[in-house]
Amino acid sequence: KKIKSFGGKSIAALAGDLACIESMFALKELMRSLGCPNLDCRQDGAKLSAKNRAGYIFNSGIAGIDETDSLLLIGTNPRVEASVLNARIRRNWFSRRLPIALIGEPADLTYDYEHLGNNLDSLRALSEGRHPFAEVLSASEKPMLIIGMGALTRADGEAILAMAKQVSDVHDMVIDDWNGFNVLHTAAARVGGLDIEFVPAKGGSDINDIQT
C-alpha cells in the first residue's frame, strides 16, 4: 500500500546483474500492476534494444569460434570478459592463423591482432571498405564480429551498434547457414532480462533517467 501511494510514475525498478529470470518477471508484473513504466535491466547503460533477440545474443555460439575465418572485436577484451571464449579464439588463431582485428582499447589478448583504432570512424572505415581489413572480411566465408560492453556502454554506443550492424550487412556476416554477429555480455542476467523485456515501457525512464 505504501508503494502504491507514491503513484506508478514516481517509482522505478532495476534488475541486478545476477538476478534470475523468475524474479525479474515477478518484479516486472508487480511494476505493471502499479502502473510503473520505469524499469531497466541494463545497469551499465548498454545501448541494447529488447525488440530483436538476434541483436543482443551471441548468435554463433562458442563453437562458432572454431568455424570463423576472420574476426573483428569491437570494444571487448575477451581475455578478461570470457576466458573460455578467448581460449577458443587463440586456438583458431594458433592452428589456422585466424586474421583478427580490434577496435577499442588495445590489450594483451594472447594472440596477434591488428588494432584499427578506438572510435566510430574506425568502424565506419570498415563499413565503407576504406580499410584493408575490410577486404579480409569480404573475402571470408564465415566472417565474425564480437561487440562488447566497452563499446555499448559509451555515450555513442547506439551509433556504434548501428555501425556494427552495417559492417555485418556489408560483409555478409549473416547468411542462411551462418550468423557471425555476436554481442558479448558481462552480466549473467542481461540476456534473460532482455528476453522478458525488462526495459522501460512506453513513456518510461531508463537507467540514466532513473539515476538523475
Segments (PLM) and residue ranges:
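Catalytic alpha/large subunits of respiratory electron-transfer oxidoreductases
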Residues: 1-212
